[in-house]
């Protein structure tokens, strides 16, 4: 009886633990972009591609995190151009920049070129890469670190 109670207590404690942040990093596959866009129909959002190995991505993530803190209504979607095995690190890095609660994805295709082609035929994989979607889902793509005034201007024009 003692062992049964102890076992049930362990199950209760384990079941009460929060889901790990890595579990919140979804696999980005061929249909993921369409799903992301469809869920935000008529709403502006930023779609930011980055990688744990990208030298300039921390600057971008820091700026996005600061903007998110000032404007909690801004919808940011992060997609890491890494592998699902790196999900714990991806979640940890995003959280360290104040982006732990934004929607997160990670490339989950053996051929990332196929995903990049579906996302944007003109994109060759340079990172960071950010897509600004306005309310009508007009899209502006920008490679490289986006200056903070540019981000603030987009937020002012699109986030209410």
PLM region descriptions:
Residues 39-55:
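Short active-site neighborhood of thiol/selenol oxidoreductases, capturing the structured segment around
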Residues 51-55, 81-85, 109-112, 137-139, ...:
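Solvent-exposed loop/turn segments at secondary-structure junctions
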Residues 96-127:
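Short, internal strand/loop/helix patches
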């Amino acid at each position: 009886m003692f062992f049964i109670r102890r076992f049930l207590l362990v199950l209760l404690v384990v079941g009460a633990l929060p889901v790990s942040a890595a579990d919140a990093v979804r696999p980005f596959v061929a249909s993921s972009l369409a799903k992301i866009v469809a869920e935000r129909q008529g709403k502006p959002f930023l779609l930011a591609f980055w990688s744990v190995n990208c030298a300039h991505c921390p600057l971008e993530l820091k700026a996005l995190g600061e903007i998110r803190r000032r404007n909690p209504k801004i919808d940011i979607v992060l997609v890491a151009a890494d592998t699902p095995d790196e999900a714990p690190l991806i979640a940890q890095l995003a959280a360290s920049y104040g982006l732990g609660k934004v929607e997160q994805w990670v490339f989950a295709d053996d051929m990332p070129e196929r995903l990049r082609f579906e996302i944007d035929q003109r994109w060759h994989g340079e990172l960071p890469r950010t897509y600004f979607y306005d309310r009508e889902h007009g899209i502006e793509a920008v490679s490289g670190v986006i200056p903070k005034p540019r981000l603030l201007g987009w937020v002012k024009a699109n986030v209410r």
